[in-house]
């Protein structure tokens, strides 16, 4: 098999990164690839954003989906277990060879039979056994050949002696025979003469005979002609008669045929009639049979139906009895619970009364102690005040003297301190300056010494390097004609090898394409994967491989329009030691054979040393490239003398599917070429360089195949290269290609030629610094002498105040037991319905049968003519007699030659056969996959980010093997496996380990020491070392399959078994049925368990968040202990601004509802408030919490893993949270999101969103029940006027989450100015939809659905909706109501009023209304309204519907005015049948109608 490099969509990268050709793919590792294990690749770092596909899993960290398996891995695994060739095993045959040689020398016929194939030994034991068999066989063959050879030698000697004796006797007999033979020859000549005369006479007679014979033949021919004439006439008449007879016969036969046809048709028709009759009869009989069967089945079905109905009826009656009994028992239990509850609450009330008495006694004791404390405290304060006055007088005198002394001392001190500060300032400045001088001197000295040391080290290094450089140049000169050396030795002064962090800029006038945009443009050119033209579809695959790499700038070059690509921020490049900071490439398309020749795609790399890709779409392309370098000052640099490498210039290495004769070349180089001795690249006209013929295949004349020279590590990579010497500031050359598809060229200073030294740059010696001199300090000032300060007075201590008594802790009364919940009764079962009987089928009718038709009679036969008599032929004349040839005299009998005596039969040459035996060995290999603990994880699951190790094992090499010259293992790693090169090297001693990033392939080559171990004793088996690949699996829901290839001595290759491991998160995984997306869920539910995601949630409601910890896909997981110790967590990032957590209600259960232990929950106010361990945990999982959060954690990760993770048991966390009451006053949306963290990997739930409605109750003042009437807020209400407080409740929006349990109006009115009349009305503010589907229209009177509580003493009215009514309202319906409280103004002044609307126990305050009542001009005597009799507050009163006459209905838009101070005699109806509001007409009418007594006025 030839080494073939397939061009397939990804260009190999070279460490040299030099200008190179169009081969795109990494060479596939195959058995025949011998020592070529991977194409040359370099790792590059890109800062560009790359779009990646994700798994669909809600992962927070590592969300990328596993990429497609590399082509190398795909083909390797497709051939898993396959073997190519084997290693020969040699067994000595020396004795056999000597026996064969001796036999040949003795004349024995030696036949070498076909070599006996002993097969392939796959183990050392098998090999040893087969070698023993071969050795035994060789010994046996040698012995048999020796025996045969010796026997044959003896037989040959005896035969030779007998042969010599017989030869002498035979010679004497032969001499006598020669004499007799001469006499015989003389007699023969005499007889021959007589016979010649007799022959002449015979020939004359023969001539006469032939003449007579001709005459007779002529007569016979004339007779024959006459006969033929008569025969012709006969045949004519015969033909006429035969024709007439034939026509008569034909007419007869036609009549017979027609008769037969008619009769056959009649027979067919009769047969059809017979068949139809039979079919009709059979159909009838079958129908009758079916009828009878259907009739029986229907009867049977009707019987079964009746039996089934009876059975269901019996079961219904049984179930009905059970349900009725169960409901009766439930009612009995409920009644018992109510009785017990009443008894408990009676006891609690008695105990609460005792507590109240104890609290009152404790309060009385406390009040007495407080009174005594206050008297004692007053006496102490008086004594302390006298003491304080005396102390203050003494203190004043002291402070006056102290002030004088302190001022004098302060003045002196200030003068001195100023002098000191001035002195300090001056000296500080001098010291600072001196310190700076000292520092500058020290820095200068240190800098100088460092530079001097560096200079000396650099100088020594330079001298050493210069000596090596000189020697290298001399060596290059001496070897310039040898393969791989420059034909003109040069040194390299340019360092331009790698700039991964360069900043690439392209002028904004040049359009940079996006991936999809460029893809669409190229497809519009006909380059498409669906194009039936294979050349164009193949060209698209090449283009797409480059276009999918987003680190390149995607450009379209237009003919003769230059495009500049500038790179700045260069860090690693220099020329003759001078730094290069910028490089500018100018690309100009000169020509192309593609389409109209005006455009071509190009891709500019982010690294200027990697440079660019361009396309030719299997046509031709020529691009001019100009290069300019700039120094740190921005000046153009002249790099004359620098060397650049033009390498990997392939020819004949194109796509076999299109045209292999692809050519890559450099043209119009404005520098000077320096050929490499032995290179295939030659200089041509126009200063171009390329190969004259194929340099890809030996069979086409190349010195090596491509795979033997076109790799980074190949010592022959100079074979496809030439070196360019720069001769001017602007470098210019053309990159040209033909039929290459994609071409990558890299412009840099890596040189493929051997022995090109880098010229060292001599260091510059540093200049010794000039040191500064330090300045002297100023002298210090003299300190002053100070006056002593006076002694301060001593204050007598105050008397301590008496201890204040502590207020006692009062006992809290116990709450009453809640009433028992009424039972929910089972519905009685539905009685069964009997299925109607099936009707009987219709009976079939017997058919009418057809009659058959008679046949036609046969026709009469014709009479024929007789045929004529044929003519008689006359016999021929007889021919004359032929003369007889004479009898000649016989020749005499010659003498008998003597019969020589038979020589003795020579001994039969024996034939000996021998054969050799062939034996091959195939060392077997095995791939194992393990976790970090060394546990086999093949065909199992492990967590994402787990360390996974691949062990590449080879069994012992067998005895008798050839010398091992190479032992190479190649492992194309699975996509998404993060390879750890350092750890792999550490785990793979005995091997040189290399990694090809482009193909994601690791190669292990046995070191020389390892090979020496293998070859120490070839006669014995030897155990092999095995390398281990170490890395991590990075993707969710990924399957990692892997095998490797072993190649020994470039001859034997074997591909291992395929191992597989899967990470959780893969739906429809055929290998792991439990595997699916790792998808934690979060659902908000109410207390009934209904999903309330997205619904309106009232303040004070409890959200029962249900968090699913999704673990089922981990079933069978075999993650390592290290992965398990990363822990298992669940994070709830709740909105603390809206919710309060309820840790007392948190529950954790498994899928079956069993409570789970070993999971703790911790709440943190913020990420910053959490421990660093928690912060690191969330950071690693890439989880960002917004504020407060809860963290659920497994206390013991290992136990948690065993019990739940490895068993695939998902958990359900119920995490209740209550909506803060204050949030209802502002309203708004709140969001909640949670995260699951397994093995350190995070997965997010969906965001749960709810909204809290803003409850905004409103209060108006009206004189009627008309909602459109004027609001008197801020206006005047007359004394004794009757009016209404309109209490408009908050709006509960539709689609709310919780049933309404409480909706109340609490009006704490000012009883000093207002008097509640005891009358109120409550109406629906909007349409209400009930659970049963009925609708209550807006404006409907709902007073009967409320209860009212009145506290006249404190001026409080509470109107509350009945709970059973509220719970009938559908959750999908909005709700709002308003209540009118009828009031009477009973005092003069301004009065303010606010009411509270409570919704599910949360209070919301309304606006405040203000009304003013002036002093009336002519006040009437008021008629007091009796205060309603206080009711039991525990038994709120339900207002009764008043019975009123039916007065004329007034227009509600024009309310009837109320007379001030005068009572009305009637109260109009407050509503019509359609629930339209009606105005109240006045207090007196209301009093008269309701029959209310006078109430005691509240006092101010």
Swiss-Prot record:
Short motif LPXTG sorting signal, span: 1467-1471
Biased composition (Basic and acidic residues): 801-816, 840-855, 1429-1451
Region annotation (BAR region involved in interaction with Mfa1) ranges: 1167-1193
Residues where Ca(2+) 4 binds: 1308-1309, 1311, 1354-1355
Molecular functions (GO terms): metal ion binding
Isoaspartyl lysine isopeptide (Lys-Asn) cross-link, renumbered residues: 927-1042, 1082-1232, 1259-1393
Binding residues for Ca(2+) 2: 1077, 1110, 1112-1113
Modified residues (Pentaglycyl murein peptidoglycan amidated threonine): 1470
Signal peptide from the UniProt entry: 1-38
Membrane-protein topology: Peptidoglycan-anchor
Region named Disordered: 764-906, 1410-1473
Keywords linked to the UniProt accession: Calcium, Cell wall, Isopeptide bond, Metal-binding, Peptidoglycan-anchor, Repeat, Secreted, Signal
Positions of region (3 X approximate tandem repeats, PR1): 771-887
Region of interest (4 X approximate tandem repeats, HR1), residue spans: 164-470
GO cellular component, one term: extracellular region
UniProt-annotated location(s): Secreted, Cell wall
Bias type Pro residues, positions: 790-800, 829-839, 868-878, 889-906
Binding site for Ca(2+) 1: 648, 650, 664
InterPro entries: Adh_isopep-form_adh_dom, AgI/II_N, Antigen_C, Cross-wall-target_lipo_motif, Glucan-bd_C/Surface_Ag-I/II_V, LPXTG_anchor, SA_I/II_PAC_V_sf, Surface_Ag_I_II_A_rpt
Subunit structure: Interacts with P.gingivalis fimbrial protein Mfa1.
PANTHER family per UniProt: PAXILLIN-LIKE PROTEIN 1, PAXILLIN-RELATED
Note: S.gordonii, a commensal oral cavity bacteria, is among the bacteria most frequently identified as being the primary etiological agents of subacute infective endocarditis (found in 13% of cases).
Family under the similarity heading: Belongs to the antigen I/II family.
Protein name according to UniProt: Agglutinin receptor
């Amino acid at each position: 098999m030839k080494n073939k490099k397939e061009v397939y969509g990804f260009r190999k990268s070279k460490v040299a990164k030099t200008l190179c050709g169009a081969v795109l793919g990494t060479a596939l590792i195959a058995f025949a690839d011998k020592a070529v294990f991977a194409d040359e690749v370099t790792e590059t770092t890109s800062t560009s954003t790359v779009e990646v596909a994700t798994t669909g899993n809600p992962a927070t960290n590592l969300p990328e989906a596993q990429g497609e398996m590399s082509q190398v891995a795909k083909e390797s695994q497709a051939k898993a277990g396959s073997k190519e060739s084997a290693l020969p095993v040699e067994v000595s045959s020396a004795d056999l060879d000597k026996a064969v040689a001796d036999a040949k020398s003795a004349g024995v016929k030696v036949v070498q039979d076909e070599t006996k194939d002993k097969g392939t030994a796959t183990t050392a034991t098998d090999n040893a056994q087969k070698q023993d068999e071969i050795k035994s066989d060789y010994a046996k063959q040698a012995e048999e050949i020796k025996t045969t050879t010796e026997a044959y030698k003896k037989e040959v000697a005896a035969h030779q002696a007998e042969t010599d004796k017989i030869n002498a006797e035979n010679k004497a007999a032969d001499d006598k025979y020669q004499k007799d033979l001469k006499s015989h020859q003389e007699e023969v000549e005499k007889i021959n003469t007589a016979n010649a005369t007799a022959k002449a006479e015979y020939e004359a007679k023969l001539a006469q005979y032939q003449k007579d014979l001709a005459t007779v033949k002529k007569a016979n021919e004339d007779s024959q002609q006459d006969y033929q004439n008569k025969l012709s006439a006969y045949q004519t008449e015969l033909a006429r008669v035969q024709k007439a007879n034939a026509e008569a016969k034909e007419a007869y036969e036609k009549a017979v045929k027609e008769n037969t046809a008619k009769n056959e048709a009649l027979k067919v028709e009769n047969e059809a009639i017979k068949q139809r009759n039979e079919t009709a009869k059979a159909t009838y009989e079958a129908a009758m049979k079916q009828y009878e069967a259907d009739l029986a089945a229907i009867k049977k079905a009707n019987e079964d139906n009746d039996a089934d109905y009876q059975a269901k009826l019996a079961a219904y009656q049984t179930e009905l009895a059970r349900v009725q009994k169960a409901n009766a028992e439930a009612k009995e239990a409920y009644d018992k619970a109510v009785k017990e509850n009443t008894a408990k609450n009676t006891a609690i009330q008695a105990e609460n009364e005792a507590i109240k008495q104890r609290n009152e006694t404790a309060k009385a004791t406390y009040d007495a102690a407080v009174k005594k404390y206050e008297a004692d405290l007053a006496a102490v304060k008086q004594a302390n005040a006298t003491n304080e006055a005396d102390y203050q007088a003494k203190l004043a005198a002291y402070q006056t003297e102290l002030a004088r002394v302190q001022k004098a001392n302060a003045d002196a001190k200030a003068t001195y301190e100023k002098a000191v500060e001035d002195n300090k300032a001056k000296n500080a400045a001098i010291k600072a300056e001196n310190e700076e001088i000292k520092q500058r001197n020290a820095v200068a000295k240190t800098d100088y010494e460092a530079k001097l040391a560096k200079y000396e080290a650099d100088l020594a290094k330079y001298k050493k390097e210069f000596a090596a450089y000189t020697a290298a140049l001399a060596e290059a000169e001496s070897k310039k004609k040898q393969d791989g050396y420059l034909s003109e030795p040069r040194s390299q002064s340019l360092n331009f090898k790698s700039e991964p962090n360069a900043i690439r800029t392209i002028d904004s006038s040049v359009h940079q394409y996006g991936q999809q945009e460029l893809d669409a443009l190229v497809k519009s050119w006909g380059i498409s994967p669906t194009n039936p033209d294979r050349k164009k579809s193949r060209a698209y695959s090449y283009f797409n491989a480059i276009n999918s790499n987003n680190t390149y700038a995607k450009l379209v070059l237009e003919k003769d329009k230059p495009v500049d690509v500038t790179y700045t921020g260069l860090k690693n490049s220099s020329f003759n030691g001078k730094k290069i900071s910028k490089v500018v490439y100018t690309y100009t398309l000169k020509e192309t054979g593609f389409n109209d020749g005006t455009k071509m795609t190009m891709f500019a790399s982010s690294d200027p040393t990697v440079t660019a890709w361009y396309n030719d779409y299997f046509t031709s392309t020529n691009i001019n490239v100009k290069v300019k370098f700039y120094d740190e000052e921005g000046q153009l640099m002249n790099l004359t003398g620098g060397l650049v490498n033009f390498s990997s210039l392939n020819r004949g290495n194109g796509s076999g599917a299109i045209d292999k004769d692809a050519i890559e070349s450099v043209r119009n180089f404005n520098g000077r070429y320096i050929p490499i001795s032995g290179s295939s690249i030659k200089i041509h006209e126009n200063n171009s360089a390329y190969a004259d013929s194929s340099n890809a295949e030996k069979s086409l004349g190349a010195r090596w195949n491509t795979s033997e020279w076109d790799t980074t590590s190949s010592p022959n990579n100079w074979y496809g290269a030439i070196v360019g010497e720069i001769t001017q500031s602007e470098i210019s050359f053309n990159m040209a290609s033909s039929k290459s598809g994609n071409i990558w060229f890299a412009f840099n200073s890596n040189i493929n030629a051997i022995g090109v030294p880098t010229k060292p740059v001599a260091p510059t010696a540093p200049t010794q610094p000039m040191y500064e001199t330090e300045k002297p300090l100023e002298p210090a000032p003299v300190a002053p002498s100070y006056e002593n300060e006076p002694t301060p007075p001593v204050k007598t201590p105050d008397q301590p105040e008496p201890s204040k008594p502590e207020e006692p802790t009062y006992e809290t009364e116990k709450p009453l037991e809640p009433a028992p919940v009424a039972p929910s009764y089972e519905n009685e079962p539905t009685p069964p319905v009997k299925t109607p009987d099936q009707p009987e089928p219709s009976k079939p009718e017997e058919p009418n049968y057809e009659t058959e038709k008679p046949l036609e009679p046969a026709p009469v036969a014709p009479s024929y003519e007789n045929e004529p008599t044929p003519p008689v032929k006359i016999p021929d004349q007889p021919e004359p007699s032929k003369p007889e040839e004479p009898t000649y005299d016989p020749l005499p009998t010659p003498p008998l030659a003597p019969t020589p005596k038979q020589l003795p039969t020579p001994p039969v040459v024996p034939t000996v056969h021998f054969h050799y035996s062939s034996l091959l060995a195939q060392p077997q290999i095995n791939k194992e996959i393990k976790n970090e603990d060394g546990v086999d994880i093949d065909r199992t699951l492990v967590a994402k980010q787990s360390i996974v190790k691949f062990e590449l094992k080879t069994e012992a090499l067998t005895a008798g093997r050839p010398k091992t010259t190479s032992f190479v293992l190649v492992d194309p790693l699975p996509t998404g496996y993060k390879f750890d090169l350092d750890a792999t090297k550490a785990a793979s001693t005995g091997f040189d380990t290399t990694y090809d990033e482009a193909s994601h392939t690791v190669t292990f080559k046995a070191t020389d020491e390892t090979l020496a171990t293998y070859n120490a004793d070839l006669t014995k088996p030897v155990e092999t070392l095995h390398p281990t690949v170490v890395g991590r699996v990075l993707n969710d829901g990924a399957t990692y399959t892997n095998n490797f290839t072993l190649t020994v001595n470039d001859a034997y290759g074997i591909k291992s078994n395929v191992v597989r491991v899967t990470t959780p998160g893969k739906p429809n995984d055929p290998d792991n049925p439990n595997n699916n997306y790792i998808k934690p869920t979060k659902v908000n539910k109410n207390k009934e368990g209904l999903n309330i995601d997205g619904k309106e949630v009232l303040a004070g409601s409890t959200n029962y968040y249900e968090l699913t910890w999704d673990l089922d896909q981990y079933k069978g997981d075999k993650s390592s202990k290290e992965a398990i110790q990363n822990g298992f967590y669940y994070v709830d990032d709740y909105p603390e601004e809206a919710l309060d957590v309820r840790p007392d209600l948190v529950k954790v259960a498994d899928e079956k509802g069993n409570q789970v232990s070993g999971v703790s929950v911790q709440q943190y106010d913020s990420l910053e408030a959490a421990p660093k361990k928690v912060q690191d945990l969330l950071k690693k999982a890439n989880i960002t919490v917004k504020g407060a959060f809860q963290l659920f954690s497994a206390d013991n990760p290992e136990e948690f893993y065993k019990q739940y993770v490895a068993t695939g048991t998902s958990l359900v966390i119920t995490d209740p949270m209550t909506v803060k009451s204050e949030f209802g006053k502002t309203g708004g949306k709140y969001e909640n999101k949670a995260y699951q963290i397994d093995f350190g990997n995070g997965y997010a739930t969906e965001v749960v969103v709810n909204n809290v409605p803003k409850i905004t109750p409103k209060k108006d003042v009206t004189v009627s029940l008309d909602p459109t009437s004027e609001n008197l807020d801020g206006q005047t209400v007359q004394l004794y006027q009757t009016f209404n407080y309109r209490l408009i409740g908050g709006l509960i929006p539709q689609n709310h989450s919780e049933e309404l349990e409480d909706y109340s109006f609490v009006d704490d009115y000012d009883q000093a100015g207002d008097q509640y009349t005891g009358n109120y009305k409550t109406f629906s503010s909007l349409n209400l939809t009930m659970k049963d589907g009925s609708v209550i229209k807006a404006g409907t009177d709902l007073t009967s659905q409320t209860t009212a509580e009145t506290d006249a003493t404190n001026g409080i009215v509470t109107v509350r909706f009945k709970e059973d009514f509220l719970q009938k309202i559908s959750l999908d319906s909005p709700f709002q109501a308003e209540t009118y409280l009828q009031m009477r103004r009973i005092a003069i002044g301004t009065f303010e009023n606010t009411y509270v609307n409570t919704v599910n126990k949360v209070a919301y305050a309304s606006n405040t209304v203000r009304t003013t009542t002036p002093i009336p001009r002519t006040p009437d005597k008021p008629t007091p309204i009796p205060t309603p009799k206080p009711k039991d507050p525990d038994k709120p009163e339900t207002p009764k519907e008043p019975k009123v006459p039916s007065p004329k209905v007034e227009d509600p838009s024009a309310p009837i005015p109320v007379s001030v101070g005068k009572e009305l005699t009637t109260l109009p109806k407050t509503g019509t049948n359609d629930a339209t509001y009606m105005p109240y007409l006045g207090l007196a009418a209301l009093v008269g109608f309701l029959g209310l007594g006078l109430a005691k006025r509240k006092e101010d």
